[in-house]
């Protein structure tokens, strides 16, 4: 009997030892999984996260590092001939030079001619209500201030032609010094209209350059615009001759409704 009891106790101890070791292994495995899970849920420092999420290259905006013709999907109409000045000549390459810009003011007589008030009869108004000065009036004011031949418009870039637009940069030079730089633009509807559009582009640049000389500065004054439209202009309901659509347009009080409206 003693031997039998000893065997049973030994077997129980063996089973208990085996069961305990199994429990320990399970607990140990569970602890390692919990540690592994906790480690994976740890939020990295802000600097580490930023470094990990930072792209390898800087994201550029559309059109970055592109020429204007590439951005507009246009083509260059011609390659301008650049005049290279030599050390022995006084010739200036106006395509790249900024000679005389802001160096000295013009005479009082010239300034008075440039800043004189516009004649109300010279100002026109578009059907949408935008008032403007015709391009030929700008040329007359420049001729009065600097004299014929005392000023000129020189190109500063190539002529860029897109599917619907012609654009080019010009500089206004008066009495041998640069005054202003502006980019002209003009729409066109067919290829046969490109030559005319290039002239319209030049005229548009001239009018923009004249803003720096103070010519017609009141055209950008909201108070003057309201007063001029109230005194010299009116709105009328008209009908388009072709489409028969009715709309309201602006025109001067001394003008009649013209085609294509009636």
Curated annotation (Swiss-Prot):
Keywords: DNA damage, DNA repair, DNA-binding, Mitochondrion, Mitochondrion nucleoid, Transit peptide
Entry annotated with the keyword DNA damage: yes
Cellular localization per UniProt: Mitochondrion matrix, Mitochondrion nucleoid
Organism superkingdom: Eukaryota
BP-aspect Gene Ontology terms: interstrand cross-link repair; mitochondrial genome maintenance; recombinational repair
Gene Ontology MF term list: single-stranded DNA binding
One Pfam family this sequence matches: Mgm101p
InterPro entries: Mgm101
GO CC aspect terms: mitochondrial chromosome
Family from the record: Belongs to the MGM101 family.
Function in brief: Performs an essential function in the repair of oxidatively damaged mtDNA that is required for the maintenance of the mitochondrial genome. Binds to DNA.
Full protein name: Mitochondrial genome maintenance protein MGM101
Species lineage: Eukaryota, Fungi, Dikarya, Ascomycota, Saccharomycotina
Gene that this polypeptide is encoded by: MGM101
């Amino acid at each position: 009997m003693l031997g039998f009891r000893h065997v049973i106790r030994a077997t129980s101890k063996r089973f208990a030892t085996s069961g305990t070791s199994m429990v320990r292994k399970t607990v140990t495995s569970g602890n390692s999984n919990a540690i592994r899970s906790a480690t994976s849920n740890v939020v990295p420092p802000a600097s580490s996260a930023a470094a990990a999420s930072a792209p390898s290259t800087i994201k550029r905006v559309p059109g970055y590092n592109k020429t204007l013709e590439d951005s507009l999907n246009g083509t260059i109409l011609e390659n301008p001939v650049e005049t290279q000045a030599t050390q022995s000549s006084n010739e200036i390459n106006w395509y790249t030079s900024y000679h005389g810009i802001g160096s000295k003011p013009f005479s009082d007589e010239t300034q008075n001619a440039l800043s004189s008030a516009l004649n109300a009869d010279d100002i026109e108004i578009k059907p949408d209500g935008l008032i403007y000065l015709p391009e030929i009036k700008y040329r007359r004011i420049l001729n009065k201030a600097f004299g014929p031949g005392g000023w000129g418009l020189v190109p500063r870039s190539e002529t860029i032609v897109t599917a619907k637009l012609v654009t080019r940069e010009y500089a206004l030079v008066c009495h041998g010094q640069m005054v202003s730089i502006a980019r002209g633009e003009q729409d066109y509807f067919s290829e046969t209209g490109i030559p005319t559009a290039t002239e319209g582009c030049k005229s548009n640049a001239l009018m923009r350059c004249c803003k720096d000389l103070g010519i017609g500065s009141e055209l950008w004054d909201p108070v003057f615009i309201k007063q001029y439209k109230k005194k010299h202009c009116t709105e009328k309901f008209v009908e388009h001759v072709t489409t028969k659509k009715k709309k309201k347009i602006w025109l001067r009080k001394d003008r009649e409704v013209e085609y294509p409206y009636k």
